[in-house]
């Protein structure tokens, strides 16, 4: 299912172990990428459910229809992993340390129900307001935000990338929000995760 916006609110989330046999069937580049996202053994991360619920509550108040996901999906082999967008962060940034994480999922890729760039920015603002309110009640906690994904790909568009980076640098994202949605196709759609974070940071 391709849900436009989802917030994971289960008790924990698992980055499942590398499937070595599956990796052997892949091209060298894909095999290398798999090592960068899957740990040698399953790694479990606690989820700050109260923060997730606060983000959902605020999003509903801001007129977003948000899915609350409570369990990781399974198949005949067992638990399905959290995907490379999160697995890469867990491996390369968190270094498999059991830091609490709250996965927020955007369907930037699969038609026909991808949120627009403007909608992603507004959702980011909603997340920012939710975190600010939650932080007021949890002064001993710190929240770090991490987007995942590239800018233009699989065809590289240097002009587009420059416009995006300059918009973030100048804190004037309106030109990017005004880009036609046809610019946010295929892998380039992942730019919307960074646009969401830009919206969040506008509330800090």
Residue spans for each PLM region:
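Short, small-residue-biased leader/transition segments that mark boundaries at the very start
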Residues: 2-3
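His/Asp/Glu-rich, glycine-adjacent segments
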Residues: 7-111
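Active-site beta-strand/loop microenvironment that shapes enzyme catalytic pockets
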Residues: 114-164
């Amino acid at each position: 299912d391709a849900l436009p916006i989802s917030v994971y609110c289960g008790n924990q989330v698992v980055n499942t172990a590398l499937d070595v046999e599956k990796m052997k069937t892949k091209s060298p580049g894909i095999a290398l990428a798999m090592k960068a996202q899957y740990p040698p053994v399953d790694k479990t991360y606690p989820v700050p459910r109260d923060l997730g619920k606060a983000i959902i509550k605020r999003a509903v108040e801001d007129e977003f229809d948000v899915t609350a996901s409570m369990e990781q999906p399974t198949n005949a082999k067992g638990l399905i992993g959290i995907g490379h967008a999160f697995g890469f962060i867990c491996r390369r940034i968190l270094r498999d340390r059991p830091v609490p994480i709250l996965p927020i999922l955007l369907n930037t890729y699969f038609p026909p129900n991808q949120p627009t760039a403007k909608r992603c920015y507004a959702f980011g603002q909603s997340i920012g307001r939710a975190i600010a309110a939650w932080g007021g009640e949890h002064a001993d906690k710190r929240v770090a935000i991490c987007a995942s994904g590239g800018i233009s790909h699989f065809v590289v568009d240097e002009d587009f990338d420059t416009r995006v980076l300059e918009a973030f640098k100048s804190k004037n994202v309106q030109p990017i929000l005004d880009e036609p949605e046809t610019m946010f196709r295929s892998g380039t759609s992942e730019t919307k995760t960074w646009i969401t974070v830009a919206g969040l940071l506008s509330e800090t």
